[in-house]
Design a protein with these regions (language model features):
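Active-site microenvironment of metallo-dependent hydrolases
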Residues: 5-6, 12-15, 22-53, 58, ...
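Conserved beta-strand scaffold positions in the cores of enzyme catalytic domains, especially
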Residues: 36, 75-77, 87, 136-138, ...
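Metal-associated gating/positioning segment near the N- to mid-region
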Residues: 68-70, 77-131, 251
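Conserved short loop/turn motifs at secondary-structure junctions
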Residues: 91, 203-208, 233-238, 262-268, ...
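Short, acidic/polar
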Residues: 95-101, 180-190, 242-243
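Divalent metal-dependent hydrolysis catalytic cores, especially in the metallo-beta-lactamase
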Residues: 101-122, 133-144, 192-207, 225-234, ...
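Active-site-adjacent beta->alpha loops and helix N-cap segments on the catalytic face
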Residues: 119-124, 209-218, 243
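Active-site neighborhoods of metal-dependent hydrolases
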Residues: 149-210, 248-252, 256-408
């Protein structure tokens, strides 16, 4: 593990490097940049630089940071506003045009599905193939490979042009044979060689199906490629850490970087115990981290395993009246719940069970990242959860500013630098994201820290956030004065560059 002194020394060195780059820029202000962001409060979570500066951008990169006036073809006035690295969403399930629209208005410049993943990862985000306003990518989806091997399903993601994936096949409920496990291993290797950003494992959706040997194979394969695993752990009774213990043991045994998905929604009232277990494992040399949402309900399919085959009311400590039908916002009773489960098994519900004090406790953990876990959204007529539109404005407005859970710089670190640093274990493309430094990618958010807030709510999920003025992706504005710029697609499909020496 890296010592605290080493980290502090590195941070000081980075700060001096940033100051040097600013000083250097004073001698070359005659250059004309593609874009200059002028007069904003620049906040870089890696160096802790926090000051008024001008940023020069050329060819999608930050090339100068200066207190001097810079010339540019486009000047963005950021006076009175914070200039932050773009927000990196590591856990989203909505690579759609509507999802993209609401994401950029919430400051998201990179949208990833690492929990579920896809297979092959090169096919992820079919709606973005003609161009994307944000960067996007996925892990290698174990669930999709399981479907291919066990059900001959070629559906590589939750949805495609042919519709939604079925939740009724053998892939969700049946143990695999040793031969099938070996076949899955080869597909996982193929997905990683195609550039998948690690391996995503929806373990809780197939609790009775995935054996210890199959799960161990997944971690062993990740170890071959020194790439992360992202796990939705098996869920027990409220607070039961057995599912976490299982994953920690595998992460330590195989030496694999492991992310526990939406820990607050899995740990519930046991969040303190769960985080202490992660701390203990990391003190022994493990590489384990986690993330949470900024909204309190869970969202998933009404036909998910936990709602079909297990005692979900005991597991979540709720009842039918705590469940909301996502497409319309209707609150359910037992009769309506069972009817919708029969008639619309691929549709979603919000189950309201997380308490805010659990979330606040999670956010106080220094390594906690924040993600959306946004459900698929295609049009305004069919509702989804508010995470899609308001996650980051809600986090910065309510938890950072209003409740004071952490300082603004630390809040920005959770949604920019920490995801970028973690994902550098999967792909070198993240080494220049999540920072405001010379040479970094010009993925930037400009917002008003006094007014940023979410308007999206359960039952009214498509209200865009307020307080976010401008968003740049690869140096090109995709949000200007709070409005999306139509027809501008600077986003890239992010994959892992292959390295013949290391297989990555």
């Amino acid at each position: 593990m890296v010592s605290r002194n080493t980290i502090q020394t590195y941070a000081v060195a980075l700060t001096f490097a940033l100051m040097a780059s600013m000083a250097q820029a004073k001698t070359i202000t005659s250059d004309v940049f593609d874009t200059v962001i002028e007069g904003g409060r620049v906040m870089d979570p890696e160096t802790n630089f926090d000051g008024i500066a001008n940023i020069g951008i050329r060819r999608g990169k930050i090339t100068h940071i200066s207190t001097e006036r810079l010339k540019a073809n486009r000047i963005i006035d950021a006076s009175g506003l914070v200039v932050s690295p773009g927000f990196i969403d590591i856990h989203s399930h909505t690579p759609t045009r509507l999802g993209e629209h609401l994401s950029v208005l919430d400051g998201i410049t990179t949208q990833l599905d690492l929990e579920a993943g896809s297979y092959p990862p090169t096919d992820y985000g079919y709606q973005y193939k003609a161009g994307a306003q944000l960067h996007y990518g996925s892990s290698v989806g174990h669930f999709a490979i399981r479907g291919l091997v066990m059900d001959n399903s070629t559906q590589g993601y939750f949805f495609s042009e042919d519709g939604f994936i079925s939740l009724g096949g053998a892939m969700w409920s049946q143990p695999a044979t040793p031969a099938q496990v070996n076949e899955m291993r080869e597909h996982l290797r193929n997905g990683l060689q195609l550039g998948g950003l690690g391996i995503g494992v929806l373990l809780d959706y197939m609790t009775e199906a995935v054996t210890e040997s199959e799960l161990s194979m997944i971690f062993a394969t990740a170890a071959e490629y020194d790439t992360p695993v992202y796990v939705h752990v098996r869920r027990g009774m409220p607070g039961d850490p057995t599912g976490l213990d299982e994953v920690i043991a595998l992460a330590e045994r195989h030496g694999v970087a492991t992310l526990i998905c939406h820990i607050t929604h899995s740990a519930m009232g046991g969040i303190g115990v769960w985080l202490s277990k992660i701390d203990a494992a990391n003190s022994r040399g493990a590489r384990i981290t986690t993330e949470t949402l900024s909204y309190l309900a869970g969202g998933t399919s009404i036909a998910a395993d936990v709602f079909v085959n297990r005692d979900w009311r005991a597991i979540f400590d709720i009842d039918y009246e705590d469940v909301q039908w996502v497409p319309t916002g209707e609150w359910l009773d037992e009769k309506r719940f069972l009817q919708y489960q029969r008639e619309f098994p691929t549709s979603s519900i919000n189950h309201h069970y997380v308490k805010e004090e659990w979330l606040v406790e999670a956010l106080k953990w220094p390594g906690m990242m924040v993600s959306t876990d946004a459900l698929p959204a295609f049009d305004l007529e069919v509702k989804t959860n508010p995470n899609i539109a308001g996650t980051y404005a809600h986090f910065l407005g309510r938890y950072v500013r209003d409740l004071g859970v952490m300082p603004l710089m630390d809040g920005l670190r959770r949604i920019t630098l920490l995801p970028a640093q973690w994902l550098s274990q999967a792909s070198s493309v993240f080494e220049t994201k999540g920072r405001i430094q010379v040479g970094a990618d010009a993925d930037l958010v400009i917002f008003d820290s006094e007014t940023i807030a979410a308007r999206a709510e359960y039952g009214d999920p498509y209200q865009p956030s307020v307080g976010i003025a401008h968003v740049l992706v690869a140096g090109r504005p995709v949000v200007v004065n709070g409005s999306q710029v139509e027809g501008r697609y600077p986003g890239q499909h992010l994959l892992t560059p292959l390295d013949a020496e290391t297989k990555r």
